[in-house]
């Protein structure tokens, strides 16, 4: 591609007039065109000054030489073939251009008078041209392309559609950023409005009820890259009228262009259409007649066939079938009529002369039935009275009435454990990841459950009880299910709260029933989740206080606990039953339950490390449709302390985001959005900062992010690199910077240079504000400054990393334990009590000394950060503009900007860009998703600008 110097060395330039509808392309005279006059060529171009470089390989001959016989691959020929022109082609004959018809007439040479006339006319034209030297003739694109082959810049808008002033106004109203009415009033009050452009209102009312405006603001002295001077505004009709009355500054109203047309009305009906319609009607009539004739013929044949078939069937039925079936039909009818006559005679004999009714009456009177019914009357009266009384009593019972009987009481006292025969929990050790230590500890239990006879022969007593403790969501219940699933034994699962009821003795009865079922089906596993609800520390242990020993609820809970202690290690301890308990509050359990013999193993289930988190993410990712471009290892390393349940929620949340965005699979952006939703919060749609507020937030966050990249690039710092920078409000934050976490060893053994580099990163937000805005800083970086102050204090007082080392002896606050459990009852006293969390220093002058040394350290690091950012001011401004445009950028984009805008890059190169907020860069994960590794084309070459 030609360089920028070659571009400005050409004699071709473009001048853009004020009228955007038409523009003039001026072609200056050069060495090869010295004998020609200045020419003009009108072409529709827009206001924007983008140019397209038409580059090709020229021949070995010089630019001043011409080629009378162009090759087949000539540039002009190829361009004209690919872009055929609507202008009639012309041919050069001598110094004159002729079209095809004129050239043919010229070649004939039959008319001598015409030739003489043309000769005299050429002489006269050449003489006039030499006298005035200012005559103009047409210059065609083919001539220009041949003359400046390979060195011509043509605006790409030449080949685009021509827009009128009204259409360009509508396009700007749609594309430009929107300005609210309040912001316009503020700008109007501060005299910042340069021009207000609107469109003329016609007599027709607006259908949408809105009116558009283009607002041109005055340029404010300062950094131009952070100022936007052109805005669009869309107001209702009433607001627009009020605003125009209030605004008294410069205005420009675009006139509506009305076109009229006068011509002859088209003939109706059209003669061609009329002839076509008549022909179609004739053809349809002929087709209809043919179809009717065919129907008559075919119908006659079908009628004849039907008549023949029906005649044959009638003759066959009358003369063949009926004579054969007639004797059999007479026989069946005679038998049926005889049976019917006999039955009717019997019915008449029974019902005549009293018949059966007289016999029933004699039996009721003389058989003793009447006397028996007389005796049942008082008995039936008593029974009916009792039934009515019970029914009335039941109708008056409360809604929460429950029937109590012996059988229901027995069923109520049963454990109702959720039993799974043959360990059908559906969970194996292969489904458990991230807690390898706990799985290794529990392998012995699985071996015992699979082969208990082997342990009995060797006299080995297996662990009777195992307590699983750890934070919520780390997999305690999952491990218990995996034990039963691996061993294939009955698994009984209950919660600690299921043993608590209103009736006395129900809890202990359920404990006995639970262990009885497990002993019958041994070997088996009993699992009680949240056992702290059942086995809380009993009252009065290790204390003399016994105020609640005679509380009924306390006695019931302690009775249930005593029954559990007996079942675990009493006189009748069941062999072959493994008891598992899970809790996240071990400090609340009774000491008698924790002693050896009851809970022989106490396994701590901790949150998974980076490798465990990666394994958990892979297990859950295998259950959903996830793109291959998603890097799960980055999430595993950047989410320390996350439990397995939270990682599972992350994958499910990412799947929901992918469905919400109509993606075919879970992409990297979906995972990032899910992480932000779970860590920071959902996007706050109702909160939208103004342009100045977004600039401040973007400057602060970019300053922090780009400082880390600069330190990694030029000082080889061992600090975190930036993953993402976002100015989208989420949760309680307006913006955020996400860093890539290092390995655990970097945080366990931090060195002084590493901590000082982190201090510079925290000070990068305020330093970036000073570089861009000067002394006009804000409190946008107050959170980073507070963290920087605390880090500087820890470097000096807690870690004692000052050189030379000075031991201050100030204990860190996290090593001080409070002297209370739970909130204080006296609220007023708790306002002024620090609960021994703050201790006086060893040296009374230590506070002043630490404050002075911290201030010196922060000031030193701040000056270094400001100097580093000033050297890379162009890259800083470019990153801020890109972040304002895209709202979120990646660390790869920051590296891309630093590569193309090295230190000491002139700021004018950025200001001369047509769109500084764009970036010709595609992140790596998007390239993997699309499978295309080609960068996006851009109208401005970044390398050429630099």
From Swiss-Prot:
Record localization: Plastid, Chloroplast inner membrane
UniProt protein name: Probable inactive ATP-dependent zinc metalloprotease FTSHI 1, chloroplastic
Gene disruption: observed consequences: Embryo defective.
GO biological process per UniProt: chloroplast fission; chloroplast organization; embryo development ending in seed dormancy; plastid fission; protein import into chloroplast stroma; proteolysis
Annotated organelle transit peptide span: 1-54
Keyword Transmembrane helix on entry: yes
Entries under InterPro entries matching the protein: AAA+_ATPase (IPR003593), AAA_lid_3 (IPR041569), ATPase_AAA_core (IPR003959), P-loop_NTPase (IPR027417), Peptidase_M41 (IPR000642), Peptidase_M41-like (IPR037219)
Organism encoding this protein: Arabidopsis thaliana (Mouse-ear cress)
SMART domains for this protein: AAA
CDD domains named among the record's database cross-references: RecA-like_FtsH
Protein family (similarity comment): In the N-terminal section; belongs to the AAA ATPase family. In the C-terminal section; belongs to the peptidase M41 family.
GO molecular function: ATP binding; ATP hydrolysis activity; ATP-dependent peptidase activity; chloroplast protein-transporting ATPase activity; metalloendopeptidase activity
Quaternary data: Oligomer.
PANTHER family, A to Z: INACTIVE ATP-DEPENDENT ZINC METALLOPROTEASE FTSHI 1, CHLOROPLASTIC-RELATED, METALLOPROTEASE M41 FTSH
One Gene Ontology cellular component: chloroplast
Function: Functions in chloroplast biogenesis and chloroplast division. Required for plastid development during embryogenesis. Might be involved in chaperone functions or play a structural role in the thylakoid FtsH complex.
UniProt key word Protease: yes
SUPFAM superfamilies named among the record's database cross-references: FtsH protease domain-like, P-loop containing nucleoside triphosphate hydrolases
């Amino acid at each position: 591609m030609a360089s920028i110097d070659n571009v400005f060395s050409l004699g071709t330039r473009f001048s853009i007039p004020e009228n955007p509808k038409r523009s003039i392309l001026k072609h200056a005279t050069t060495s090869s065109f010295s004998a020609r006059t200045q020419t003009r060529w009108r072409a529709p171009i827009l206001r924007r000054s983008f140019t397209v470089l038409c580059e090709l390989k020229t021949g070995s001959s010089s630019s001043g030489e011409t080629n009378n016989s162009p090759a087949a691959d000539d540039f002009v020929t190829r361009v004209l073939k690919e872009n055929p022109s609507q202008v009639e082609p012309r041919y050069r004959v001598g110094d004159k251009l002729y079209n095809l018809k004129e050239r043919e007439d010229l070649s004939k040479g039959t008319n001598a008078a015409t030739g003489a006339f043309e000769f005299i006319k050429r002489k006269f034209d050449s003489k006039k041209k030499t006298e005035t030297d200012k005559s103009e003739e047409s210059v065609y694109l083919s001539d220009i392309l041949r003359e400046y082959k390979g060195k011509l810049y043509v605006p790409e808008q030449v080949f685009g559609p021509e827009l009128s002033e009204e259409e360009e106004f509508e396009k700007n109203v749609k594309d430009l950023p929107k300005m609210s009415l309040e912001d316009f009033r503020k700008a109007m009050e501060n005299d910042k409005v340069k021009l207000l452009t609107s469109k003329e209102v016609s007599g027709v009312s607006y259908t949408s009820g809105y009116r558009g405006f283009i607002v041109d603001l005055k340029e404010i002295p300062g950094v131009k890259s952070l100022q936007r001077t052109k805005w669009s505004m869309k107001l209702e009709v009433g607001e627009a009228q009020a605003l125009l009355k209030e605004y008294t500054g410069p205005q420009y109203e675009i006139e509506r262009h009305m076109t009229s047309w006068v011509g002859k009305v088209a003939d109706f009906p059209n003669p061609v259409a009329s002839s076509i319609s008549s022909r179609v009607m004739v053809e349809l009539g002929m087709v209809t007649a043919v179809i009717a004739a065919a129907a008559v013929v075919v119908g006659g044949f079908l009628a004849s066939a039907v008549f023949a078939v029906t005649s044959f069937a009638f003759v066959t039925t009358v003369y063949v079938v009926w004579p054969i079936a007639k004797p059999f039909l007479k026989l069946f009818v005679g038998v049926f009529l005889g049976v019917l006559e006999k039955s009717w005679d019997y019915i008449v004999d029974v019902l005549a002369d009293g018949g059966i009714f007289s016999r029933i009456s004699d039996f009721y009177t003389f058989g003793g039935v009447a006397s028996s019914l007389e005796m049942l009357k008082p008995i039936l009266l008593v029974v009916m009275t009792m039934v009515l009384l019970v029914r009335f009593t039941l109708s008056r019972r409360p809604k929460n009435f429950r029937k109590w009987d012996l059988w229901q009481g027995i069923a109520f006292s049963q454990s109702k454990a959720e039993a799974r025969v043959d360990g059908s929990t559906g969970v194996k050790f292969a489904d458990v990841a991230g807690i390898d230590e706990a799985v290794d500890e529990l392998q012995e239990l699985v071996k015992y459950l699979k082969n208990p006879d082997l342990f009995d022969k060797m006299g080995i007593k297996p662990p009777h009880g195992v307590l699983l403790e750890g934070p919520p969501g780390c997999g305690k219940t999952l491990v218990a299910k995996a034990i039963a699933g691996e061993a294939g034994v009955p698994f009984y699962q209950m919660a600690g709260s299921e043993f608590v009821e209103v009736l006395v003795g129900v809890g202990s009865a359920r404990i006995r029933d639970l262990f009885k079922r497990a002993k019958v089906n041994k070997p088996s596993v009993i699992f009680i989740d949240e056992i702290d609800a059942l086995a809380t520390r009993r009252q009065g242990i290790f204390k003399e206080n016994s105020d609640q020993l005679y509380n009924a609820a306390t006695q019931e809970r302690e009775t249930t606990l005593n029954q559990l202690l007996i079942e675990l290690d009493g006189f009748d301890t069941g062999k072959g039953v493994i008891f598992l308990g899970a809790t996240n509050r071990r400090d609340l359990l009774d000491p008698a339950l924790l002693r050896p013999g009851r809970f022989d193993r106490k396994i701590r289930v901790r949150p998974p490390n980076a490798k465990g988190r990666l394994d958990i993410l892979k297990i859950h990712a295998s259950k959903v449709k996830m793109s291959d471009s998603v890097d799960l290892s980055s999430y595993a390393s950047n989410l320390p302390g996350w439990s397995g349940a939270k990682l599972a929620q992350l994958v499910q949340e990412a799947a929901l985001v992918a469905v919400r965005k109509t993606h075919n699979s879970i992409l990297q952006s979906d995972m990032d959005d899910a992480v932000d939703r779970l860590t920071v919060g959902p996007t706050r749609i109702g909160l939208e900062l103004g342009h100045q507020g977004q600039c401040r937030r973007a400057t602060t966050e970019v300053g922090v992010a780009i400082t880390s990249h600069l330190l990694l690039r030029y000082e080889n710092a061992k600090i975190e690199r930036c993953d993402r920078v976002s100015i989208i409000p989420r949760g309680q934050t307006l913006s955020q910077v996400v860093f890539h976490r290092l390995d655990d060893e970097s945080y366990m053994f931090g060195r002084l240079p590493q901590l000082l580099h982190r201090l510079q990163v925290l000070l990068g937000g305020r330093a970036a504000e000073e570089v861009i805005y000067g002394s006009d800083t804000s409190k946008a970086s107050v959170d980073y400054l507070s963290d920087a102050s605390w880090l500087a204090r820890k470097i000096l007082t807690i870690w004692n990393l000052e050189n030379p080392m000075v031991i201050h002896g100030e204990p860190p606050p996290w090593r001080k334990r409070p002297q209370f459990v739970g909130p204080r009852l006296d609220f007023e006293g708790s306002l002024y009590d620090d609960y021994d969390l703050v201790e006086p220093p060893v040296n009374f002058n230590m506070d002043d000394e630490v404050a002075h040394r911290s201030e010196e350290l922060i000031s030193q690091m701040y000056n270094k950060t400001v100097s580093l950012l000033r050297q890379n001011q162009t890259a800083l401004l470019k990153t801020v503009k890109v972040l304002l445009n895209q709202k979120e950028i990646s660390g790869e984009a920051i590296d891309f900007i630093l590569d193309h805008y090295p230190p000491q890059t002139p700021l004018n190169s950025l200001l001369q860009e047509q769109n500084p907020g764009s970036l010709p860069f595609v992140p790596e994960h998007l390239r993997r998703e699309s499978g295309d590794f080609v960068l996006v084309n851009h109208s401005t070459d970044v390398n050429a600008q630099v």
